[in-house]
Structure formats: C-alpha cells, structure tokens
Amino acid sequence: MMAPLTDRRHLWNDGSALEVHGVVVTRLTPGPAPVLTAELGGGVAELAGGADQTTLVRLDVPLGGAVGYWHPAAGWDRHLAADWMTGWRAIGLADSAPLGCLYDGSANTLLAYATDRLVATTHLKFGLGERTGRFGIWLAMDLEPGEVCRIRIAEPGRSHADTLRELARWQSPETGLPVPDAGRTPTYSTWYSYHQDVNAAAIEAEAELAAEAGCGLLILDDGWQRGGTGGGYSGCGDWEPDADKFPDFAAHVAEIHATGLKYMAWIAPLLLGQDSAARAALAGFAPHARPEWGCHVLDPRHAEVRAFVVDSCARLVQSYGLDGLKIDFLDSASAYASGTHAEAGNTADPVPTGEPAAEGWIPDVGTAMRVMLAALRGRLHAALGTDFLIEFRQPYTGPAMLEYGNLLRASDCPADAVANRVKSLDLALLAPDVAIHSDMLMWDASAPAEQAARQLLAVLHTIPQISMRLADLPAEHRAMIAFWLGFWRDRRDLLTRGPVLAGRPDELYPLTTVTDAERAVAVLHTVNHLVPLDLSGLREAAVVNATDSGRVVLDLRHQSAVRLTVSDACGRTIREEHTRLALGPSSVAVPPSGLCLITPITEV
C-alpha cells in the first residue's frame, strides 16, 4: 500500500541528489542515493528501493522561460500550475504513462523525462514552487529493496515533439503488436451514427457506402450484444449477439467482408451489468460500482476475472470470424489502483485493497492487466496469426500498451474538431510508430460542406474514423468525404508515418506540418497564423485551409516560381495560375476548408 505523502511541506525538502542535463534528481525518502549510469551518454538515473515501502523522488529545474507543461493526461489544462494546485494521480498500464515535458515559448524542452516503470502503479504530481522559483515533478513508487526504476532525462533545448517521440520510443517494447494494413485505412464506426440502434440490415447497407467512400475497416460499436439497449451498460457481461438485431451474426460478418471491409466489434469486458446473466457468478469479483452506468467494474487482479475477459474476447473473434476488437473501458480498472493519492474529482473511487491471498491473485492492478492482455494476445495470435486488430483509446494508450493493441484512438469528443486535433496529436507523441486513429467524426448533416469538412481536416494527420449515416448525407457532403479521403489515401504514409510538427501544446497546435523528401502537407487550423514553407527540393506542397477565412498567408524561405491549383471543400478546382511567390509572407486566396496545391516550376 502506498504510504501517505500528501503533506506539501515536504515536497521541496533536501535529500540525496544528483544532476542530469541540468535537472536535479532528489530522493526524498530514506534509501540508496540515485545513481547516474553510462546509458545514453549519462542521461539515465537509477533509483533503487530502500527500507521504506514508498520511494519518493523529485525532478526539478529553474523555471527559466517556461510557458507550459505537457503530459499524456493534460487535456485542456496545459498551464504552469503551482504545486498546491495539482493532486496526486495514479498512472500505470491502464491509465496514462510516466513521461512529461516542461517547455519554453519556442516549444523547446527545459525538463523532459520518462521512466521505465510502465506497468506497476506510480503516483505522480507536478507544479512550480512559489518559494523556490523551480518546477518540480514528484514520483512516488512502491519499490522493493533492490528493485530499480530507471529515469531518463532528455537533453534540453530540442523541440518538445522530437524529444517526446524519442522518450516514447525508449519506453516502447521491442515486441510491439504489428499493424495490419487494414489498421491504416479510413474507418467507418457505427457509434455516433447509430449508437445502440444497430441491426444487420442497416449496417450491411452502410458498409457498402463506406467501402465506396474509401474506407477499409468497419467498427461495430455498442448495441450488437444482448442487453445492449437503453443507453447504459446494465446488460454488459454476457457478450452474445442480440438475436433480434443480428439473427445470424456469423453470416452478417461474412456480408461485411464481402464488401471488402475488415470488421471489428466493440466489447467492454471489465463491465459487469446489473442485468447480465454473468453477474450471478462474477459479482463477488466486482466490488466497484458505477451506478450511473448500471454496472460494476470487474477487478482484474483476480485470476477468475482475467480468464473471463480473455475467454469473452477470444470467443467473440473466433466464433464469428471478426478481424479484431475495440476494447473499451480498460481504464476503469484504475479503480483498483492501490494507494491514497487518487486525484481529487476522479470518478474511479479507490477501493480497499486488503484482499485475502488467493490462487492467481496479483496485488498490483497494472501487473494484473499486463498478464491478462498478454494472455489475450496469445489466444488471438494462435487463432489469427499477426493479422488481427485491437483498438485502445485514451487514456490507456501509453507505450507499454503497444504490446497488446495496434490501433490507438483519441478519446471521445463528438463534433469537437479542436479537441480531436489536440487529443490525436498528443497521442501521436506517445506512440509515433503505430496507427493513430481519430475519435469518430460527426457533424451537422444540414451544415454547408465546408463546415462539415472541418471535422475531417482537423485529423488529417491520423487515420480518420467516419461516423455519419452516409445514406442520409447530402450529395455535397458525400463529395467532400470522397475528395478528402482520396487526398488522404494518396498521402497516407506521409500523413500517418512522418513526424508531424504542430507548434506549442498550450496553443492547441495551430498548424500541423509534415514533410518528406518530395512532398509537404500543411494544415492551417487558426486564422492569421503564418504557414512557413521551404519548397527547396519538393515536387509538391499541399496547404489545407481548415479555417473560416478565405485566405492563407504563406511564409516562404526562398522566392519560387510555382503553379497554384486551388480547390474547394469538395475538390472542385476553382483556380489555376502560374505565379512567383516572393521571399517572406504572401497572401493566397484559398476558400474555407479548401486546398492549395503548390507545384514548383523551373523557369527557362
């Protein structure tokens, strides 16, 4: 059990310390002093467990020109919080990841760190000291005597994005789950378009239209299962198809496959509904209640729960020929994280952990989740080889989860293009080498096409998930989807595999840019923001105007003779011209949600 460490008076105490790249690493509890290793040129400190059950360490630097602090669970709150403003947060395999970055006004790092404690629970807080003028990060861990936690400190001065990608790769397992090609194709999801009102005929008709629009994957969300009605989760736990909605689920899956789409289904295996048949046998393993959902949360520390989850997931895939699963609500297991530092306002109320010894009992919830997910991976690999898809969503999308999931999705933000952009870019920093999916896209079907397009343009740097009833959309909207998905497919590897530059996190990433040896794509999300361009060596630059303005301002590093091809939100060409763009700012007319293709030409 994590010892109480809530007295803020002790946060800035002295202790055994060392300095790594200008960051002071201080042990605040009794035990061996931190040790600097030779790894990565001396950028890794080791901290060993001591006599005290809880090991507390502080990382701190002078504030300097700090403007914000990024961490995986930042959400909208990216300001410089004082140490008394932030609570302790439990992080582990099922929730977030132990890394973060303090950055300056140029989005360059002042303090960036990561630890290798990715599975077991770590309690974390951060903030600036009003008396010290320093920014601190505190990590509290249960380390056994001799057990070691490695803390990597990045060299300061590099861009926060490059630094975080490097730290995430350091944390990532070498045995990550491969991503089948279907995981990198535009996706149709039934959630916002149908919610629980799904049935075989409707989804089969929608699949035809999704395939025609350019999707390669369909995700059947909540509502396919028995008891999947009423908007809550009171029926979760049985995981059998609703025979009224899907009389022959295996035949239905075959119909979807006939359209050329891969097919995944939603499952929330840790939720035990109050009306489920499974409740009679499993209620004793689910003490944490979610009355607003009509269910309890199964505790994965029990062997019986782990076996139930693995069997439920594997049986669903194998019995019906599915290509994978969207596994939801794994973060609900955080209710069973040990300790006394649950963040104020967390909906997952801590549950007492004084569990009697039992066969297969694993005290740490992160470790239990790892065992459970490893078993599931093994079962699916035995059945399907490496060609299966597992979607996880924020916040259980840290580097350690790459061993068990290969589609990582931004958490729910219906119709909020800004949130979808920010969440998916945050996620891409944590998992730079896997398939990052947007949250499902929805919009007002009666809105002009250029307004609807804003949802898709916000997430061009991800694999987009569409969730609108395609048959009900006006022709302009269908044309818009077809045009932009075609644009995306033609640049898929550039958009989803190239390192995206997006500016400062606290400015919510106003401009996303990605470049390879031949092409560049810049998506402008904020009016009156310059679009820097260097056309040297490029055969094409695409500038996407994802704003309400009818103009974009390019900022060229060199004057260039170019051909401009300008299209509207539906892909209709409205202007072609040859012109010379001068060094520095140049204003170019591009309609809202429109595209400007810039092709350098050689003058003779």
Show the residue positions of the predicted features.
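Glycine-rich, aromatic-flanked loop segments that form ligand/cofactor-binding clefts
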Residues: 160-175, 217-220, 244-291, 387-392, ...
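Glycan-recognition surfaces
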Residues: 279-295, 299-304, 370-474
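Carbohydrate-binding surface patches
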Residues: 504-563
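N-terminal accessory beta-strand-rich subdomains and adjacent acidic, glycine-rich linkers
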Residues: 1-174, 534, 552-556, 562-571, ...
